[in-house]
Amino acid sequence: MKYIIKLFINLIFISISFNLLLFSNCIANEIKLFYEIYYGPFKIGESEIQIFSSKYTAIVYSVGLAKSIFPFYAKWETWVDEKGYPKKAIIYSKERGKERKRAIYFKREENKIIYQKLLPNCEEAENIFLEFPIYDELSSFIASFYIDYTIYPRIRLPLFIKKKRDYVKIEFRERKNCEFEKEKKECLYIEVYLPKKSELLERASEVEILLLKDKKVPLELRGKLPIFGSLVGKLKKIENL
């Protein structure tokens, strides 16, 4: 059960990104997204994602029986510039009473990332020199909403994960009919191939996404877990702020 619950957490922190040379911050409205996460018929978690022009926040936590077995809470905050690139990220998690917290600062002018662990023990900051531009996991997730998949059906992009520059592959497969709030919608079916590493924990390497074409947000996220099958994150509500 522990590993099943851990997998759903990463459905929210999916690392997919836009063409880094062409992307600009396309956020027109400030919104909050509410998701419920299921293992089969059982609801095991919830998530909230807040999207502002200068800051993104994702919160995820276990609920119900899953919370009693594996209590988990995580909050990821990323401050971004006018083009959507990360300037600073604060990542906090609490798992069965054990707290972890990290701060990451992106210095694009110097091709430098400052990485510091704050909890459970405060450690000395590290300077990591990598090629820019580069995204963290949350900012790349938000950026992915605005990709024109008819122009970019296959993309391989760099991400900052675990002190290194890694890559994610994203492939547009097909258009699908879907439903949200009792209305028929058009969705884009996308497959994402992720590094198994994450700033939070290990995750599934393949994730499927149904993206609402008109609202430009994920309607459904599905992570593949060998033997056990798939966990599903479902969009329940969009709130304009």
Model-derived features: positions:
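Positively charged n-region of N-terminal signal peptides that target proteins for export
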Residues: 1-6
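Hydrophobic, well-structured mid-protein blocks that either form specific transmembrane helices
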Residues: 101-145
